[in-house]
Amino acid sequence: KSVLIYNMQKYYLLLIISISAILFNCAGRKIDLEEELSINFNKALKFFNNGKYVRAKDEFQYIIMTDPGSKIANESQYYKAEALFFMKEYEDSWDAFDQYIRFTNDIEKVEKSRFRICECAIASTNIYQRDQKQTIRAVEQLQMFLEDFPNSYLIQDAENAIIELRNKLAKKDFEVGRLYLKLEEYESALIYFRSVLNNYYDTNFADDARIGVMFTHILNDNRKGAKNYYKAEKNRFINTQKGLEAKALINETEEGLSLSHYFQLYK
């Protein structure tokens, strides 16, 4: 019996020693990995700061794949997203920032990342002549940013970006209205001019849309409609010069449009 007890004690002692050795070895490897990745991170950060964004992105990606979920991997995810942004890979950058936001507790970087997502959306928009779905998406992202970070130091930048994007959307509708006007599709022209006034009344194109409505009535042999519209809208012109231009359009077209008016229409 004593021999059996001795053997069991010996077995458990060996087991404890083996487990301790394994744990010590694992801990050592963990420390070695952390040291290795710290070196990689500093190397990647140096590439990033020197504007070598492709090299930086690859190095940060290596860290993310080698030790996923770690603090250094999460920090690498942020800089990978930044590198992609500067590489003008805006959709990939958006995805990378979104991934970073999900797993970080750094509120300051969350705010910066959310605004970067807005910038990615803005950079993905088309010129006004093309489809404007991306512009609408960018406005929505900026509005969500304003709601989520009402005290952000980036508020003014976000508001200015919204103004610029809304002007682009207004210009799109205004130019479509002008096109229909030139094609003598008067009802369609009015739809687009009114869209500017209903949806983008605070933009630079609102006054132009009012004048566009007046032009439409005049070209459609409806001077009375043009005069009544001017009377109803004359105090709503944002720009004084545009208001005077509208008044002159009524006063100078009793006998029809002159060459200068057609130039104004088709310029």
Regions found by a protein language model. Name each.
Residues 9, 23-267:
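Acidic, polar-rich low-complexity tracts and alpha-helical solenoid repeat scaffolds
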Residues 1-26:
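Sec-dependent bacterial lipoprotein signal peptides
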